[in-house]
UniProtKB/Swiss-Prot annotation:
GO terms for biological process: translation. Keywords: Ribonucleoprotein, Ribosomal protein, RNA-binding, rRNA-binding. GO terms for cellular component: ribonucleoprotein complex; ribosome. Signal peptide: none annotated. Belongs to the bacterial ribosomal protein bL9 family. Gene3D superfamilies: Ribosomal protein L9, C-terminal domain, Ribosomal protein L9, N-terminal domain. This is Large ribosomal subunit protein bL9. Binds to the 23S rRNA. The keyword Hydrolase does not apply. The keyword Cell inner membrane does not apply. The gene is rplI.
C-alpha cells in the first residue's frame, strides 16, 4: 500500500515521501496518528498545496524538541527504590518511573524514554536515552539508590 508521509517516520522517509508499507501498518498506525495519507492523485495534489505548512510545523516541533533537549543535557536524576542487600531491586524501574522523575523538571512522555536493555533491576548509575523527536535524542544519567 502506498502512502504519502506527512511527518518524518524512522526507517520510512521524510515529509512528502511516497512509501510502500504493509496495509495494516498504514491503517492501524500511520493514518490514525496523522503521519500519512493514502497515495491517491487527489491526496498528492492537496499535499503539494500544504507542503510548506507541514514543513513549517515539522521544523517548529523539532525546534521545541531541541529546546527541551538543552534543558535535559547533562542532567542527573535520582530514583529511590526498595532494594536488597546486594543492590537487587524488589521490582523494577521502567519507562513510566523514569518519565515521572524527569517530568519534575521537563515535560517528558513515557513513550520518549528508551531502555534498549529493558527495565532497570539493580541500583547504580545508568545512561538513559530520551528521544524527544525522531532527530533529537539526549542522554541523561539516572541514579538508582536503595530506599
Amino acid at each position: 500500500m502506498e502512502v504519502i508521509l506527512l511527518d518524518k517516520v524512522n526507517k520510512l522517509g521524510g515529509i512528502g515521501d511516497v512509501a510502500v508499507v504493509k496495509p495494516g501498518y498504514a491503517r492501524n498506525f500511520l493514518i490514525p496518528n496523522k503521519k500519512a495519507v493514502m497515495a491517491t492523485k487527489a491526496n498528492l495534489a492537496s499535499f503539494e498545496e500544504r507542503r510548506v505548512e507541514l514543513e513549517a510545523q515539522a521544523a517548529e516541533r523539532k525546534a521545541a524538541a531541541e529546546a527541551r533537549a538543552l534543558t535535559l543535557e547533562g542532567k542527573t536524576f535520582t530514583i529511590a527504590a526498595n532494594a536488597g542487600d546486594e543492590g537487587k531491586l524488589f521490582g523494577s524501574i521502567g519507562t513510566r518511573d523514569i518519565a515521572d522523575a524527569i517530568s519534575t523538571q521537563v515535560a517528558v512522555e513515557k513513550a520518549e524514554i528508551r531502555l534498549p536493555e529493558g527495565a532497570i533491576r539493580h541500583t547504580g548509575s545508568f545512561e538513559v536515552d530520551v528521544q524527544l523527536h525522531s532527530e533529537v535524542i539526549v542522554t541523561v544519567t539516572l541514579e538508582v539508590i536503595a530506599e
